[in-house]
Amino acid sequence: MPEAVSDGLFDVPGVPMTSGHDLGASAGAPLAVRMRPASLDEVVGQDHLLAPGSPLRRLVEGSGVASVILYGPPGSGKTTLAALISQATGRRFEALSALSAGVKEVRAVIENSRKALLHGEQTVLFIDEVHRFSKTQQDALLSAVEHRVVLLVAATTENPSFSVVAPLLSRSLILQLRPLTAEDTRAVVQRAIDDPRGLGRAVAVAPEAVDLLVQLAAGDARRALTALEVAAEAAQAAGELVSVQTIERSVDKAAVRYDRDGDQHYDVVSAFIKSVRGSDVDAALHYLARMLVAGEDPRFIARRLMILASEDIGMAGPSALQVAVAAAQTVALIGMPEAQLTLAHATIHLATAPKSNAVTTALAAAMNDIKAGKAGLVPAHLRDGHYSGAAALGNAQGYKYSHDDPDGVVAQQYPPDELVDVDYYRPTGRGGEREIAGRLDRLRAIIRKKRG
């Protein structure tokens, strides 16, 4: 019996699929799930991929055998096409989300598919957001795809040439989906208004409101249906039609509920960084959890933490950068969901670390001087003296080798003449910089002694 697409976009594989027109979507499922096309005739857009005899149409009609990677923007129909392929072929359907599945889950699904194949059952394996899989997770699929233990249908919003390992690319067809046109989106919205699976005309929607939904969707059918659903709920509660004003009042709520690509996404990222910088570890964990639950790319979070480690902590807590880099490496090596713990670990470490922006201000001051033209000649004794003729130019003459001094530090001019005695790095008195400040004073006193 084919297995179902869950209401949570494949969060729970192995749920039996109900028969009938709705592809397993319950009445309480989000509008975008209830309105998922149940046949090719209901698919809107992607005509370039669904022409007669095309690889994708053959798959959906049950005659294709090649694994595919569906590459396209959010809301363009990748999940829908995966479900249609399974339904049309009558094969077992297994679904994994790269956000929640690790190598263990991948191998378990493949093993179940091997057993099913012994009984003549072939399996369609759908992997949502495959670009979030680590190399190890992707490698675990190779043998099963090559020997057709599973027919892989993978979806990604990122260019697979950069996010999917080469051996998996070579074993799959790459099919690029295009954003829906305005007319495509309008057709999706109107169907949801009219169809009993959707609103079933239970609430009136002004034509101007439909226009606004199409505009806000920007080619993303799911975004349009999410906004429509929230607006319809508000309109029904107030006993009014869905107007432009209803849409405008509801769109922020819709973004918070379902959308990780709009303004709310950037607000949460900003709040996360500012909470870590502000040392509020609990708020930082809250915003981290919101990003993870919303499906934020863990690599993006790791990159932000690495930047913050130098920008807002620096030498006050030198281990912060090591922890942030280790977290990024862990994300790349093991992927999700296990890497969630590593991101939390790094977030806690950075939020509780002593803070300093002295590295940031030091580099900014040095670069401002360069832009202002303060880039004088390198002192002659510091210039390269290893080539023939260097000595005749005075290069490296009089250079003092620091290791010849018992303290490893000598009095010597290092900056150009224009920048002698300029202090760029000004450590704070916090964390590791408390000790550095005293040491730096001593170093500068030795180095800047009167030069002969």
From Swiss-Prot:
InterPro entries tied to this protein: AAA+_ATPase (IPR003593), AAA_assoc_2 (IPR032423), AAA_ATPase_RarA/MGS1/WRNIP1 (IPR051314), ATPase_AAA_core (IPR003959), DNA_pol3_clamp-load_cplx_C (IPR008921), MgsA_C (IPR021886), P-loop_NTPase (IPR027417)
Residue numbers binding ATP: G72, P73, P74, G75, S76, G77, K78, T79
- Give any GO molecular function from the UniProt entry: ATP binding
**Keywords for this protein:** ATP-binding, Nucleotide-binding
User: What are the GO BP annotations of this UniProt entry?
Assistant: DNA synthesis involved in DNA repair; DNA-templated DNA replication
> Sorted alphabetically, which Pfam families does this protein's record hold?
AAA, AAA_assoc_2, MgsA_C
Q: Which family does it belong to?
A: Belongs to the AAA ATPase family. RarA/MGS1/WRNIP1 subfamily.
Cross-referenced PANTHER family, in alphabetical order? ATPASE WRNIP1, WERNER HELICASE-INTERACTING PROTEIN 1 FAMILY MEMBER
What protein is this chain from? Uncharacterized AAA domain-containing protein MT2636
The species this protein was found in = Mycobacterium tuberculosis (strain CDC 1551 / Oshkosh)
